[in-house]
Curated annotation (Swiss-Prot):
It catalyses: (2E)-decenoyl-[ACP] = (3Z)-decenoyl-[ACP]. This is Trans-2-decenoyl-[acyl-carrier-protein] isomerase. CDD domains: crotonase-like. Homotetramer. The keyword Cell division does not apply. GO terms for biological process: fatty acid beta-oxidation; unsaturated fatty acid biosynthetic process. Its EC number is 5.3.3.14. Belongs to the enoyl-CoA hydratase/isomerase family. PANTHER family: ENOYL-COA HYDRATASE, POLYKETIDE BIOSYNTHESIS ENOYL-COA HYDRATASE PKSH-RELATED.
Length: 261
């Protein structure tokens, strides 16, 4: 794999985002590798737990804006739609996989990556972590199941406010709202993880598989209908002038001038 690192440590599969030169921005190849790694971990009977973390100063900015700029300039709507489909599938996979999925967040996590953190069963954050629904900044709406996941985690009103303002949610506030399991200093993050794994290793993997299925069936029965709506909206938004303006403005380091078209 070129864009992530996949390794095994006893019963733990570790997926590390490894594009720090672009702040671990998601593009099609990396998304496909994440799905491949998740499938490897899911199908390996020796793996009982999955950890997703990242190299670099930030966890991820979400979508790769350099790639978005290329797609906008070339009017490449299919690739933009493909990314939206892939990140949605990753969140869906995290929720469906019959093993506990942990995510370690240090620094900013934005866009689709922030929503994958919500999808994880346990999010461990450093005190420097910030969770950002950055989509409105480029004229989009949340993807990777964002509103579906957030509204069920923190309530409809808070989910809407985060999505509409794009405000950064601190690690402490995320902990208070229940989005984060534990917050620690960066140098203590690994210890926090090991404490959690020690606790999780006390129970049967069959229990975790059953619990995840029960949680899913009780709260996410309408996912497919939601995912279809989300993808169609994202495809439509990706064709707007405001989206093109948002991406170009970000690339040019200026404030976007949205016109509602």
């Amino acid at each position: 794999m070129e864009h992530i690192i996949y390794q095994l440590e006893e019963d733990l599969a570790i997926l590390t985002l490894n594009r720090p030169e672009v702040a671990n921005g998601f593009h099609i190849p990396m998304c496909e590798e994440i799905l491949e790694a998740l499938t490897l971990a899911e199908e390996n009977p020796a793996v009982h737990f999955i950890l997703i973390n990242a190299n670099g100063k930030v966890f991820s900015v979400g979508g790769d804006l350099v790639e978005m700029k290329r797609a906008v300039d070339e009017d490449d709507i299919p690739s933009l739609t493909k990314i939206a489909e892939l990140v949605n599938t990753i969140s869906y996979k995290i929720k469906q996989i019959a093993k506990p999925v942990l995510m370690e967040v240090d620094g900013a996590v934005a866009g689709a990556a922030a929503n994958m953190a919500v999808a994880a069963d346990f999010c461990l954050a450093t005190d420097k972590a910030k969770f950002i629904q950055a989509f409105v900044g480029v004229g989009l709406a949340p993807d990777a199941g964002g509103i579906h996941l957030l509204s069920r985690s923190i309530g409809v009103t808070r989910a809407a406010q985060l999505a509409m303002t794009g405000e950064a949610l601190t690690a402490e506030k995320a902990l208070e709202w229940g989005l984060v399991y534990r917050v620690s200093e960066a140098e203590k993050l690994e210890k926090t993880r090991e404490q959690l794994l020690k606790k999780l290793r006390r129970a049967s993997s069959n229990s975790y598989a059953a619990i995840k299925k029960l949680v899913w069936e009780s709260q996410f029965k309408d996912w497919q209908g939601y995912a279809t709506l989300e993808l169609n909206l994202q495809k439509s938004l990706a064709q707007t002038e405001d989206f093109k303006e948002g991406v170009r403005a970000h690339s040019e380091r200026r404030r976007p001038k949205f016109i509602g078209k």
